């Protein structure tokens, strides 16, 4: 999701067989994005505590106690490595690693999420080679942690579709070259990786390859009129299922696995029904859908309409009971 983070901080063919994955009784991945380290994107590198923050690990443990098992941790590439193929900012890396380790030490999954929309310093990433090197360097830091998941880049948009394919493949190649061979890789698509527009925009991503066969296609789906996730109203009680229908068939037709990496709805009865519609559709097709992650928790959301931050976030108090039915 694209938000004004500075403001927020202040206020039909034969289906192929999908790769098999051992599941929990419910979703394999069910969790929350933990926003903060990507805030203040207009201030690079920015000041920790002023322009951006890191998730509160105690809040994460609270969410784990409620039944969430997956936490997507967004960060900015430019803060981690001021030059794409250069060295790390050690302070930023230390803070990121600390959050990742807190999640995985608790037995949950930690998604390392480059929240850059296919850009670096505001410019579209055009060098697949540099992107591969960047991911090789980053993945090497987490190669021994089997509970880490790599998210290639958040919400590519307004980019050449072949470039999106090439960047995703470069990320996969770099991650595996780093010796990170046990982890899942979440790949994202163009047009903000929307599930409802996936078949129109991202069909070519079916050609991505991974020697470990651990690619998961991450799609995002909001339930408001324009699918942007910027309104607290939802189109209808059934819009969730409707918006993932074509993507579900694409996964089945191509023998792929998917996850909804962002979803949300407002604190009202129509949205609660719409969220249930979405999650029920994913559960009914759990041969291809591995789960979903709420947008979002994080310590700086204050009165944000989708905040899952314990213990007084609007979604934490108003939507958690709906989500608990899908936990284990």
From Swiss-Prot:
Q: Which organism is it from?
A: Emericella nidulans (strain FGSC A4 / ATCC 38163 / CBS 112.46 / NRRL 194 / M139) (Aspergillus nidulans)
**Biological-process GO terms, alphabetical:** cellulose catabolic process; glucan catabolic process
| pH dependency | Optimum pH is 4.0.
Residues with glycosylation annotation: 95
UniProt keywords (A-Z) are: Carbohydrate metabolism, Cellulose degradation, Glycoprotein, Glycosidase, Hydrolase, Polysaccharide degradation, Secreted, Signal
| One annotated Gene Ontology cellular component of this protein | extracellular region
Q: Enumerate the InterPro entries for this protein.
A: Glyco_hydro_5, Glycoside_hydrolase_SF
This chain's function reads: Has endoglucanase activity on substrates containing beta-1,4 glycosidic bonds, like in carboxymethylcellulose (CMC), hydroxyethylcellulose (HEC) and beta-glucan. Involved in the degradation of complex natural cellulosic substrates.
Protein name according to UniProt: Endo-beta-1,4-glucanase B
Annotated GO molecular function terms are: cellulase activity
Q: Which family does it belong to?
A: Belongs to the glycosyl hydrolase 5 (cellulase A) family.
One Pfam family of this chain: Cellulase
Q: What is its main location?
A: secreted
Which reaction equations make up its catalytic activity? Endohydrolysis of (1->4)-beta-D-glucosidic linkages in cellulose, lichenin and cereal beta-D-glucans
EC? Answer: 3.2.1.4
The signal peptide stretch is 1-17
Q: Where in the cell is it found?
A: Secreted
Annotated thermal dependence: Optimum temperature is 52 degrees Celsius.
Q: Which gene encodes it?
A: eglB
Where is the catalytic site? 155, 262
